[in-house]
Amino acid sequence: MQFSTTPTLEGQVIVEYCGVVTGEAILGANIFRDFFAGIRDIVGGRSGAYEKELRKAREIAFRELGDQAASLGADAVVGIDIDYETVGKDGSMLMVSVSGTAVKTRR
């Protein structure tokens, strides 16, 4: 499965548009990691715990996107948009959502 943020794939022709596909992931952040990440951010370092959670959520969302596209018979997803948002009463969860258009292509 190919993924692209662009509306086309260089060197390939889109022969069929299969529909809009989406993938979402919501992950809760551990309170202790949040505490130590906050301390690290105060002293100017990067938060490895947050970066790991973000990467994990993005991978899950893209896996869902690809699975949905494959179920439509597509071999690529174009025009992908990636959104990040904190959710929950206290912003303790991270949501990653991806969407795009599933397509069939040929060279």
Curated annotation (Swiss-Prot):
Pfam families: YbjQ_1. Disulfide bonds: none annotated. InterPro entries: UPF0145_dom_sf (IPR035439), UPF0145_YbjQ-like (IPR002765). NCBIfam families: PRK02877.1. Belongs to the UPF0145 family. This is UPF0145 protein ESA_02470.
